[in-house]
């Protein structure tokens, strides 16, 4: 074996203790001192190495989605959609692709309870024959904002106050009072689904609009949906308090224990598609991430199933170092002009480079399983063995060539450079429809959560009035009930 091409792993552990460089360690219990009670000597390299390594064990926490759990498995195509996409891993029923999935909470820190009211991340990395595909979504089909320009401000509002280091309702209510497009997302977050029972019993959504392209270059806008075969289950507020007080890692434990017991979680993948030529036929913009596509007019189409049948081997290597980015796509799947997706394309890779370093895609959990070739050389923590003489392109001494051209959306865009909001905002209709779909008891729980949120003493009379106005525009009875419980008059 060529030692220069050997990747270190626990599989090559020696039977005795060593330093990182392989030197034998005959005493891992005591520091080197002058005599039995004398001072420690600086020449105790093993002690210095051990402490220095310990001091650097932690890496920067994810700015969002810090708390998470991962598992591995496979995705299998069950229905032919080759007329919609030329993606190789979707080429025919029966095709299987290895995957790794990370579930997470969003706002709270790495050690926070998994029972807090918060969206849940649902990110899937497909290791395909044409490179990796990252489908990075949530357990709710919409989002709070439609323009990524507001993403840092939104996260700041949700995160703890810079003064008190506590999450405070008045900051959230204040920020989103300027963003009525958030009402639809809040109709999910303040609903029962705001606290999933665990990761196995929650849905997943790609959230953003993507584009499928077939072999003829025909594009279709697409939304991705994951449906758990064991059904959707949630925790009510009092149940969440009990569960969280018993085990703050209950969802991680449930996922790990279920897989270990052979009770493998499974999700069915569905898509919705819209012909770009028909995108103006709706009362919403299909690129607006705050909207769902009504399933009665844009039905779900089955694609495949995902089974998680293996727990990760190491939390740090396969969860903390696991990195997703919506920019990582494969031929046959492309981006759309969704404003939030466009900003995520940059931001996700940028934060991974900050967290893990410029060569984070070389880490085993992030590297593609297919062959790959480029001149992205060197940089911090580059551990790939390379012996090429040519590190430029093109060259007559290197046979590497361009890949075959793949179809991309043929759309021609024209327009003025401008910063503006979309024409079809329609901020209240879908939120109202969702509220009216609840049974009376569920409506009352939703209402009470908003009463509690707006009862924060820092929230002004003006802010309460704005939110009552917003919810009144979603549903008049909801606004009236909210005003009544807050002892205010609804002001449309």
Curated annotation (Swiss-Prot):
The keyword Signal does not apply. The gene is CATB. This is Catalase isozyme B. GO terms for biological process: circadian rhythm; hydrogen peroxide catabolic process; regulation of cellular response to heat; response to abscisic acid; response to absence of light; response to cadmium ion; response to heat; response to hydrogen peroxide. Keywords: Glyoxysome, Heme, Hydrogen peroxide, Iron, Metal-binding, Oxidoreductase, Peroxidase, Peroxisome. Its cofactor is heme. It is an enzyme of class 1 (oxidoreductase). One of its GO terms (molecular function) is heme binding. It is found in: Peroxisome; Glyoxysome. Belongs to the catalase family. SMART domains: Catalase. InterPro entries: Catalase, Catalase_AS, Catalase_clade1/3, Catalase_core, Catalase_haem_BS, Catalase_immune_responsive, Catalase_sf.
């Amino acid at each position: 074996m060529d030692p220069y091409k050997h990747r270190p792993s626990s599989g090559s552990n020696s039977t005795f203790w060593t330093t990182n460089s392989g030197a034998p360690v005959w005493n891992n219990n005591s520091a080197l001192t002058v005599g039995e009670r004398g001072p420690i000597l600086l020449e105790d390299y093993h002690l210095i190495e051990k402490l220095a390594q310990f001091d650097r064990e932690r890496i920067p926490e994810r700015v969002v989605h810090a708390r998470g759990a991962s598992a591995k498995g496979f995705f299998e195509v069950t229905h032919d959609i080759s007329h919609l996409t030329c993606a190789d891993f979707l080429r025919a029923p029966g095709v299987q692709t290895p995957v790794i999935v990370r579930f997470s909470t969003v706002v709270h820190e790495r050690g926070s309870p998994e029972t807090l009211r918060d969206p849940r991340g649902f990110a899937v990395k497909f290791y395909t024959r044409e490179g990796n595909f990252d489908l990075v979504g949530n357990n709710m089909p919409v989002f709070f904002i439609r323009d990524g320009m507001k993403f840092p401000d939104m996260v700041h509002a949700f995160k703890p106050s810079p003064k008190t280091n506590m999450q405070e309702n008045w900051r959230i209510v204040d920020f989103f009072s300027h963003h009525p497009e958030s009402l639809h997302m809040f109709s999910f977050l303040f609903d029962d689904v705001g606290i999933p029972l665990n990761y196995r019993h929650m849905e997943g959504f790609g959230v953003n609009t993507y584009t499928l392209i077939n072999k003829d270059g025909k594009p279709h806008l697409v939304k991705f949906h994951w449906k758990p075969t064991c059904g959707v289950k949630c925790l009510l507020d009092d149940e969440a308090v009990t569960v969280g007080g018993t085990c703050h890692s209950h969802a991680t434990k449930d996922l790990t224990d279920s897989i270990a017991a052979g009770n493998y979680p499974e999700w069915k993948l569905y898509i919705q598609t819209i012909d770009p030529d028909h995108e103006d036929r709706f009362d919403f913009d299909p690129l607006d991430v705050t909207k769902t596509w009504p399933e009665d007019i844009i039905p779900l189409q089955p694609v495949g199933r995902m089974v998680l049948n293996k727990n990760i081997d190491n939390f740090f290597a396969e969860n903390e170092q696991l990195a997703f980015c919506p920019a990582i796509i494969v031929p046959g799947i492309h981006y759309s002009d969704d404003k939030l997706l466009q900003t995520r394309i940059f931001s996700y890779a940028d934060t991974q480079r900050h967290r893990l370093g410029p060569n984070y895609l070389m880490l085993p959990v992030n590297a593609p399983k297919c062959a790959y070739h480029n001149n992205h050389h060197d940089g911090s923590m580059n551990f790939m063995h390379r012996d090429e003489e040519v590190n430029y392109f093109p060259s007559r001494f290197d046979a590497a060539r361009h890949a075959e051209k793949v179809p991309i959306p043929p759309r021609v865009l024209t327009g003025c450079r401008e910063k503006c909001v979309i024409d079809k905002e329609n901020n209240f209709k879908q939120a109202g429809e969702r509220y009216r779909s609840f049974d009376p008891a569920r409506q009352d729980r939703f209402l009470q959560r908003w009463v509690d949120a707006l009862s924060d003493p820092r929230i002004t009379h003006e802010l309460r009035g704005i939110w009552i106005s917003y919810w009144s525009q979603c549903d008049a009875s909801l606004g009236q009930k909210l005003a009544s419980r807050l002892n205010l008059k609804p002001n449309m």
